[in-house]
From Swiss-Prot:
Protein name, UniProt field: Relaxosome protein TraM
Organism placement in taxonomy: Bacteria, Pseudomonadati, Pseudomonadota, Gammaproteobacteria, Enterobacterales
Function in brief: Conjugative DNA transfer (CDT) is the unidirectional transfer of ssDNA plasmid from a donor to a recipient cell. It is the central mechanism by which antibiotic resistance and virulence factors are propagated in bacterial populations. Part of the relaxosome, which facilitates a site- and strand-specific cut in the origin of transfer by TraI, at the nic site. Probably autoregulates its own expression. Plasmid specificity is conferred by the TraD-TraM pair.
Gene assigned in the entry: traM
The keyword Cytoplasm appears for this protein: yes
Gene3D superfamilies: 1.10.287.2320, TraM protein, DNA-binding (1.10.10.450)
Cell compartments where the protein resides: Cytoplasm
NCBIfam families in the record: PRK13713.1 (NF010267)
Cytoplasm listed as a keyword: yes
GO annotation, cellular component aspect: cytoplasm
Quaternary organization: Homotetramer. 2 homotetramers cooperatively bind to DNA although they do not contact each other; cooperativity is achieved by DNA kinking and unwinding. Part of the relaxosome, a complex composed of plasmid encoded TraI, TraM, TraY and host-encoded IHF which binds to the F plasmid origin of transfer (oriT) in a site- and sequence-specific manner. Interacts with TraD. Also interacts with TraY.
Membership in a protein family: Belongs to the relaxosome TraM family.
Gene Ontology molecular function terms on file: DNA binding
Species: Escherichia coli
Domain of life per record: Bacteria
């Protein structure tokens, strides 16, 4: 194992010490959470992240093209489902049942989507 001396900022030093202290409070043994071992682990993790970013830059993945394709598929799906709902609401098997009237189905879908979206994107008081 190579030995390296390096200088780090006080902020980084304090954060590493906080990690060590937290792990000790969680019951880790003194020798398992030394400053050297923790700093080495963080350095290796940082190197993996750096290498992954470099690989991503070299890949042919185009985020804008992916977003465009994804949006196109979502719009096609939305349009198709709207037509299917319209057809289904005219079925004699469900006629007279307000639950299957087109306007009610659309409103029900919007409410359910709103609840799910709120889970992932909570509304701020500013909005």
């Amino acid at each position: 194992m190579a030995k390296v001396n390096l200088y780090i900022s006080n902020d980084a030093y304090e954060k590493i010490n906080a990690i060590i202290e937290k792990r000790r409070q969680e019951g880790a043994r003194e020798k398992d959470v030394s400053f050297s071992a923790t700093a080495s682990m963080l350095l290796e993790l940082g190197l993996r992240v750096y290498e992954a970013q470099m690989e991503r830059k070299e890949s042919a993945f185009n985020q804008a093209e992916f977003n465009k394709l994804l949006l196109e598929c979502v719009v096609k799906t939305q349009s198709s489902v709207a037509k299917i709902l319209g057809i289904e609401s005219l079925s004699p098997h469900v006629s007279g049942n307000p639950k299957f009237e087109y306007a009610n189905m659309v409103e029900d879908i919007r409410e359910k989507v709103s609840v799910e979206m709120e889970r992932f994107f909570p509304k701020n008081d500013d909005e």
